[in-house]
Amino acid sequence: MEPEALALTLPIRRLVEFLLRTGSIDSRFTGFDRALEGARLHRKLQRAAVKEYPDYQAEATLKQDYACAQITYTLEGRADGIFTDTDGMPTIDEIKTTTLPPELITGEQSPEHWAQAQIYAAIYARQNGLPAMRVRLTYFQVDEELEFRFSHDYTADALDAVVTDLLTQYAPWAKRAAEWQRISRASLAALQFPFPGYRPGQRAMIGAVYKICTEGGQLLCQAPTGIGKTMSVLFPALKAVGQGGPVFYLTARGTTRAAAENALALLRASDAHLKLRSVTLTAKDKICMQDRRECTPEACPYAKGYYDRVRTALWDALDTHALTADALQMLARRHKVCPFELGLDLSLWCDVVIGDYNYLFDPVVHLERFFDTAGDYLFLLDEAHNLPDRARGMHSGVLAKSAFYDAKKRLGKGKSSLKNALTKVNDIFIEWRHRCEEAPGDSRFGRTFFEKSRADTLDRALTRLCEPLEIWLDEHRDPDETHEALLQLYFDIRAWLRVADTFDDHFVLQISAHGSEVRAAMLCLDPSDFLTADFAKGRAAVLFSATLAPAGYYRDLCGLPDARAVALRSPFDTEHLGLWCARHVSTRYKDRADSIAKVADLLAVMSGARAGHYLAFFPSYSYLQQVWENFTARYPDRPTLCQESAMNEGKRAEFLAQFQKSDGRSLLGFAVLGGVFGEGVDLTGESLIGAAIVSPGLPQVGPRQEQLRDYFEQTRGSGFDYAYRFPGMNKVLQAAGRVIRTPEDRGVVLLIDDRFLAPDTRRLMPPHWEQLRVVESAETLAGELERFWGRAASLEGKAVSSPAR
């Protein structure tokens, strides 16, 4: 019986780089931004070629099937140019930019460049019945702006032989990938839900996700805590992988990636026959195994010779199905390769890729190997309420005067073109400082002004600065403090110019001054157009969170006007949650001083009604500190814990560990609303039995927030809602969601501010908040809490712990 024929679509560039690339990882300064400068120079050379050769076709798409070793390959790619040379020979032109010194550009330094062009020539010759083709490599040396051309003529048979040889080398990889896909798809088709039953709402969520993943489109899914969101999106997406894939599980925070890893581990444990390969992409600084990250062959043994060893490492790694950060580091040590780059290379061989939002949405670091063109991908976005703000940040740019002044000082005395260029940029910032001094506002807190157009004068000065800065960086490669400062400045300038190229009426330019410092910021007010284009790169997308209301707001800002939306009810018994609003307190900025003691009293009553752990969330650090000082002075016997303004991962873990202790005592934690403890924290059972949300969480009124308000008032007619009310209520609901994490949990939530009762705010509350009750004093709250905990005790059939002392 003949073996079943395999079919595989393969990008030509990926094929040749995979098989032929050698050498080391070297992330040192290369003299130009490869993506931007390379594309610009390609276009420049192509325009010149069109003038030289009238029939020159730039960016010509080529696609052809080849059969080799019982595999049918569909090879596809884009030739930089196809033309008829002066002697009548049809020619493929492959253009490469390089920073190699001119004397090292021989035409033989990169075999993969020849192979790429030879495959293009083989396809063109086959499709046009040509007996021979010419292949030309055009190298452009960017520092000297010199062009080098190298040509070879080949018969069509010789070109076909090159293709056959490369495909024969690739055949073991293709067969392994095809065999994995066959058994993986079969095992996923047979995969059963890993639990004996479904939680309330879970079946509906699974059905909605499966429908989107199979039919295509986008889904906004609001799923309260307890439904099991992670499994409810991963399970149906994996069942639908035969209709598309791979699956990208994207998160806003590194801590939530563990939820996806745990869900996949549970699926594997529930089905011994499941064949599912996943990789977790971890930030380079976190997964680096060196004491100091320096990605050069001289400094890092894992970078040196990476491309010589990576294929052996990949072949070995494909036997590991859960490629977590720990697994990648283990493999990297075994094969002496970089774990970060290994994870990226492995992503092409995986069914599930877990990583940060930026791998899809950030124009600088998105995964080019997937997203330079559209594919049959499934996107699952956890904590999707964070996407609009994250996207704004990805498409904004910031520069500070001090960075240019500091760079100039570091260069010492003496004149140079670099110092002159830095001075011209610095002078622009000084002019802006004078304008800021004339702007309205209190100079003690800084002054600012806005423009609706980009900073053309600055952009021109920055463009002129790039060349001498590149020359200096190329001549000073030792990684000392001055080099690092100027290299970071160069990257910041490039990032700024990249944003400037996209500046339109969705942006605003802000210039602000405080003392001698001046900052320029291009602020992306509305990222929806960018997100629309990003989502179009996949087959389907599911955006899910406990807080995606109102749906129209998220459809709008996420660039998904046609997305379906589902909102599921909480699966928990509403009797388990005690919910009150303290109407007698105003936390408006003008009323803050009068509110401090009242808030402290309410917190004392809440945390004293039953021994346990509580969190109180505040709109700012300063307000938090004021209430904490009042509380600890008046209730010195109550244990408290205070979030600090800058906490590393270790300190955050220590903070949360205090809530895991079961010592029978009360603990009241003070945290910032919308901060690291306000979402993505899972404290079940007695770890957290109450939360107070102090204020409706409206973002602080300021120049930037008012720009958002004005923009959305003009474009949507809902300025206050888009800039203040909706983001604020989202933070409130996230913080309140820290209480009641399992069906057995019981807890209380206290909303402190009369504005929670405004009709427009009440409309944003979820259905399971229907039992919201109003209290007018701390004494009234004490009575309400006594009754709530008394009912809870009778239902539990045991005595409630005595009040905290």
Where are these regions (language model features)?
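Metal-dependent nuclease catalytic cores that hydrolyze phosphodiester bonds in DNA/RNA
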Residues: 1-85, 89, 115
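Mg2+/Mn2+-dependent nuclease catalytic core
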Residues: 64-160
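Conserved pre-motif I regulatory segment
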Residues: 179-222
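A substrate-engagement module of RecA-like helicase motors
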Residues: 185-186, 192, 245-353, 361, ...
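Walker A/P-loop
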Residues: 214-236
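Signature of the SF2 helicase/ATPase Hel1-core->accessory helical subdomain module
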Residues: 233, 258, 335-352, 357-466, ...
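A contiguous, basic/glycine-rich beta-loop/short-helix subdomain that forms a polymer-engagement track
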Residues: 328-353, 363-370, 471-586, 590, ...
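Conserved RecA-like P-loop NTPase helicase motor core
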Residues: 583-594, 644-757
